[in-house]
Design a protein with these regions (language model features):
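N-terminal beta1-alpha1-beta2 module of alpha/beta enzyme domains
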Residues: 1-72, 167-170
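Flexible, glycine-rich active-site loops centered on histidine and acidic residues
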Residues: 2-20, 80-148, 191-193, 198-202, ...
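Conserved, mostly hydrophobic/aromatic
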Residues: 3, 36, 44, 63, ...
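Hydrophobic faces of well-ordered beta-strands that scaffold small-molecule active sites
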Residues: 3-7, 40-42, 72-74, 102-106, ...
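An alpha-helical appendage that flanks or caps ligand/catalytic pockets
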Residues: 5, 124-161, 202-313
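Active-site mouth loops of central-metabolism enzymes
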Residues: 7-22, 77-84, 166-176, 232-235, ...
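Acidic (Asp/Glu)-rich catalytic clusters
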Residues: 33-34, 60-68, 91, 95-102, ...
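Alpha-helix-loop-beta-strand connector modules within alpha/beta enzyme cores
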Residues: 53-74, 130, 134, 333-345
Length: 345
């Protein structure tokens, strides 16, 4: 099982400058590159300081000039926010500039806050339908001379300009959860990205079950790869692990508040949650975070990751967005590289 870093600029306070957050994100990616991680993933979000990521291709092009070896992945572009011709062209240009280091992760999106601003009236179902129309379209645009008459997009015969360096195209990954999304990915020759979010390892097993069932159903298609994304913290003591569980619990409370889309947003920042609100959450608790997420000293983390490797996961992505200080993120990532990854070499 190989390892990657999943990272964004995350701004939780107006005291943090966006330039500093960008520089810190780049430094974490450079640590991952020097440390032998396989890839860096960064995604797309709009008008949210919680996850500042208006166009992942911009970040990846910059990273290509500041790293040497890591694959550079979109984790993920949000299909309904793109036109197929624009996505095919920007992805192909990124592949050329990065000298063939691009992986493309694509998702339907998750936040109604973004949907109502980017595609008013769209719900999660129709976002998923756009994803299913998008992937065959961009593949055909890269082949060239492709005419499209779909439900959401129509255009006459077109060839992506440019076409990607990697042939027939960069690896495509689909963010999947339910059985249908796994089946769509496998049937279309795409790799799969999954995350249990805050849930425990029974969810990790369930997601692998969906993937295996899809591979069995479409056994005529070469088996794609599957990546597991989890919030991870490699601690230097149990006290440090407990602090991380508290911090990740706070992160998930804010994640949930953005997801519900009911709280006031001012200057791109959501209204702060009080300690009482965080403590009253029905299922986000520090105890659940400590148990479910990959939080612990090196040996505990190794044991968890060995179990995921045995399940059949090809890649484990270290989700570092946690609301922690840069110093704590950096220390955890360095312990991951120095104390955990060598066991899997």
């Amino acid at each position: 099982m190989r390892f990657s870093l999943f990272v964004h600029m995350e701004r939780v306070s107006d005291q943090q400058t966006q330039k500093q957050l960008y520089d810190e994100m780049i430094e974490l990616c450079q640590i991952a590159d020097r440390g032998g991680m396989h890839a860096v993933w960064t995604g797309e979000h709009h008008a949210m300081n919680f996850t500042i990521a208006p166009n992942p291709f911009l970040n990846l092009v910059d990273l290509a000039n500041k790293t040497k070896n890591v694959r550079l992945g979109t984790g993920t572009v949000v299909a309904p926010f793109w036109h197929p011709i624009k996505l095919a062209g920007e992805a192909a240009m990124t592949d050329i500039i990065t000298n063939g280091r691009l992986d493309i992760g694509i998702a339907r999106g998750a936040y109604s806050f973004e949907y109502e601003r980017m595609v008013p009236g769209m719900d999660a179902w129709s976002a998923g339908q756009r994803l299913r129309e998008m992937i065959p379209a961009i593949k055909n645009l890269w082949k060239g001379d492709y005419e499209h008459n779909g439900e959401f997009w129509q255009f006459p015969k077109t060839t992506s300009a440019p076409q990607p360096l990697q042939q027939p195209h960069p690896p495509i990954w689909v963010a999947a959860r339910d059985p249908n999304s796994h089946e769509f990915a496998v049937q279309n020759g795409c790799n799969v990205q999954v995350t249990p979010l805050h849930l425990g390892d029974e969810e990790v097993e369930k997601l692998m079950g969906h993937f295996n069932a899809a591979c069995e159903k479409f056994s005529d298609v070469p088996r794609p790869e599957i990546m597991l994304l989890r919030h991870t913290y490699v601690a230097d003591s149990e006290e440090d692990a407990q602090l991380a569980a508290d911090e990740i619990n706070t992160f998930y409370n804010y994640f949930g508040a953005w997801f519900k889309n009911e709280r006031e947003i001012k200057q791109g920042l959501i209204a702060p949650l009080s300690p009482e609100e965080i403590a009253a959450h029905p299922f986000y608790t520090p105890e659940a975070m400590r148990k479910n997420n990959v939080i612990g000293q090196a040996q505990e983390v190794i044991d968890r990751l060995k179990a995921y490797e045995a399940m059949g996961y090809n890649e484990y992505s270290f989700w570092i967005d946690t609301g922690m200080s840069f110093e704590r993120k950096k220390a955890s990532l360095e312990r991951m590289i120095n104390e955990v990854m060598p066991v899997f070499a």
